[in-house]
Amino acid sequence: MLVGYARVSTEGQSLNRQIDMLVDYGLDKRNIYQEKISGTKLRRDQLDKMIEELQEGDTVIITDLTRISRSTKDLLNIIDRIKEKGASIKSLKDTWLDTSGDNPYNSFLLTVMSGLSQLERDLISQRTKEGLRSAKARGRNGGRPSKRNDKADTVGLLYREGYKIVDIVKQTELSRATVYRILKDLNLK
C-alpha cells in the first residue's frame, strides 16, 4: 500500500500543494498523514503514528526530503524505522531516495549520508573535547558557579557557633542539601 506524509512548518502554511502531488502520484487522500509542525521537532505525532501503522511491503511517499526531516541524522533514523517495519520510502523530488528496490546507487548514497552523519558527530565531539581542554588550561572548569563560594564561610561560622541547620538555611537562603554539602566539604558533618 502507498502511504503519504505531508508536513508544513507552521499553522499558516498550506498542505494543499503536497497533498495534490501525492494524490497525482496515486495515493488515496485517506492514506496521507498530515502535520503542521516544525521539522526540527523530534516528536511529530503523525509521523510516529504513520510509522507505527506501517505494514510489511508498504511504501511511504513524500514530496521531498525537507518535509520529513531537517537533518541527515534524523532522516537516517526515520529511514531505519521505516525499514524495520518492512516498508520502504520514496521521495518524488529527490529521486535518488527510493529504498523500495535493490538499486546500488540509492544504497551507496544512503551509505555516504550515514558516513557523513557519523563524521559530523565525531567532529562535534572532537571540537567539544578540544574546547573543554582549552578552557581547563585557562583555569575554567565549566559548569555553573558554586553557591558555596559566597556563603560557605558563613555556613561554617554559624554551625560552629551552634546554630541549628534550619536556622542556617533561613539566614543564608541556601537549600538544606546545600548547607549539608558545605558542612561536609568543611569536614564539619
From Swiss-Prot:
InterPro entries: Homeodomain-like_sf, Recombinase_CS, Resolv_N, Resolvase-like_N_sf, Resolvase_HTH_dom, SSR_resolvase
Region Disordered, residue ranges: 130-151
Keyword DNA-binding listed: yes
Residues of the active site: 9
Annotated GO biological process: DNA integration
Gene3D superfamilies, per the entry: Homeodomain-like (1.10.10.60), Resolvase, N-terminal catalytic domain (3.40.50.1390)
Keywords associated with the record: DNA integration, DNA recombination, DNA-binding, Plasmid
Binding region for DNA: 165-184
PROSITE patterns, per database record: RECOMBINASES_1, RECOMBINASES_2, RECOMBINASES_3
Domain Resolvase/invertase-type recombinase catalytic: 1-139
Keyword Nucleus: no
Any one GO molecular-function label of the UniProt entry: DNA strand exchange activity
Functional description taken from the UniProt entry: A likely role for the res protein would be to stabilize pCP13 by reducing the number of plasmid multimers resulting from homologous recombination.
Family label: Belongs to the site-specific recombinase resolvase family.
Protein name: Resolvase
Source organism (scientific name): Clostridium perfringens (strain 13 / Type A)
